[in-house]
Amino acid sequence: EALPEEFDVSTMQKTKIQKGMSSTMSVNRNIDNLMNQLEETFSQRLLRMIDERGMTDSEAYTKAYVDRRHFSKIRKDVNYVPNKKTVLAFTIALELSLDEAKDLLASAGFALSRSSKTDIIVAYFLQNKIYDMFEINDVLDAYGQPVF
């Protein structure tokens, strides 16, 4: 799978040792440059999206059926990554567009898959701007999938 266009690895080519400078130093410098391009973590992105929507934390996690202690882990640890089901629940609770949902999932290291019934169902509801968790759970259950 190709890297996104904005992820430029062309500068990461190892250089031959010249004038006593090791290729490791060159690679480290190039990796440092890439580290300066880091995107938001899942936690940072989620908290920003909650704020942008004018929601309180408790409104967001309650609507996503996430308990307070679990949300506290997300809030306190900038690098914490919940499971995919939790991320999907937040995409619905925050009433994200399909593109926003894909971005939030990607920030946690996940993607919507066409081989997953749950993903197909959630994507359908997001694409059609239907954010009723009860309705989504009914359809998930009808297709034998775990509910939120």
Language model: regions and residue ranges:
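The alpha-helix within a helix-turn-helix
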Residues: 50, 61, 91
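A short, Lys/Arg-rich alpha-helix, primarily the initiator
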Residues: 23-56, 134-148
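Short, basic-rich loop-to-helix N-cap that marks the start of a DNA-contacting helix
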Residues: 78-93
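Short C-terminal boundary/hinge segments that cap the last helix of small helical domains
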Residues: 96-110
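Helix N-cap / loop-to-helix initiation motif
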Residues: 56, 67, 83, 95-100, ...
